[in-house]
Design a protein with these regions (language model features):
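Active-site pocket-lining/capping segments in soluble small-molecule metabolic enzymes
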Residues: 1-307
């Protein structure tokens, strides 16, 4: 219960109040106090119920002589042959139309049956869009590139291999350990928010074999629900009546210094704006190899055939 320590009232002279009004004020005050106390004492929902400390390996303990493994992400079917000819160890497919995944998987296996092929999920997944996952399963890939927690939950018990992508934002040993264990992921892509020094710190604190590093790519700068293609290149209002201009037009946005940045749509009609200038971390390769990292990735955008090689 509660005990009133003091009370100060400032009322006009001659005012008469029934006792019921005072009781109402007392009850309202008690309810407000109880609400505040419950909010202060309630446990934080995101707090782990027990201490969770990932195991760590000292520098150089994670098989530094392991051969490097190179995976390549393709965004167009015609990129597949040159990527396989160049000697990729694994292929990730990230197509706008998920219905093309089955043909992409077939193309990889016809060209190089021993090369594993992974299919990328959308960055964002709404509850009504689990049909995308079923479509990916029917393509019969070797594995899935997990880009959101809904995909991690859906494929958690799948026999397919599961790789965590950059959008899971693995930036410290705790997030890496939780996602790898709870999501049953084979390995994780390091967050794009980390600089080279921070990547090195994470590799020293966590088993390097947990990770893959995107070494060369056009950095995704914005991912948005708004569809530029539908808004400016059609008279429609959604995928039902826009006529799919994203399948016919190549769109780039020009920034204030004249640089062109490619814009791509995904299966959910969400748009991603990519940096028109490729970013590479090749200069840090030897240092990361010395720290035990062996998995690296190259991501293609609309690269010409000569650059793909």
């Amino acid at each position: 219960g509660f005990r009133l320590a003091s009370c100060e009232c400032r009322l006009p002279n001659g005012l008469m109040l029934p006792l019921s009004i005072l009781n109402q004020a007392r009850r309202a005050l008690v309810e407000q106090i109880q609400t505040v106390r419950q909010e202060r004492e309630a446990p934080v929902p995101s707090r782990l119920s027990a201490a969770f400390t990932p195991s760590a390996l000292p520098a150089g303990a994670a098989a530094p002589d392991a051969p490097p493994h190179l995976s390549v992400l393709c965004r167009r079917p015609e990129q597949i042959p040159s990527v396989l000819d160049a000697g990729a160890d694994a292929v990730y497919l990230d197509f706008e139309d998920l219905r093309d995944y089955a043909a992409g998987v077939k193309a990889v296996r016809q060209h190089a049956d021993s090369i594993p092929v992974f299919l990328a999920t959308p960055r964002i997944q709404k509850p009504s869009e689990t049909g995308y996952f079923k479509l990916m399963e029917r393509a019969e890939p070797d594995g899935i590139l997990i880009r959101n927690l809904g995909a991690a939950q859906y494929f958690r018990h799948s026999p397919l291999r599961r790789i965590g992508d950059f959008s899971l934002n693995v930036a410290n040993p705790y997030s890496a350990a939780i996602l790898k264990e709870r999501g049953r992921l084979e390995y994780l892509t390091l967050s794009y928010d980390l600089n080279a020094e921070q990547v090195a710190d994470l590799l020293r604190a966590t088993p390097p074999e947990w990770f893959e590093l995107t070494l060369h790519q056009h950095m995704p700068m914005f991912h948005m629900e708004h569809c530029v293609f539908c808004t400016f290149l059609s008279d429609g209002t959604s995928y039902k009546n826009c006529g799919r201009p994203c399948e016919r037009h190549h769109v780039q946005l020009r920034d204030r210094v004249g640089q062109l940045h490619p814009l791509l749509a995904d299966a959910g009609c969400r748009n991603t704006l990519f940096n028109g200038r490729a970013q590479t971390g090749a200069g840090f390769l030897r240092g990361f190899r010395r720290l035990g990292l062996s998995r690296f990735r190259l991501e293609l955008l609309d690269d010409p055939r000569s650059e793909e090689r």
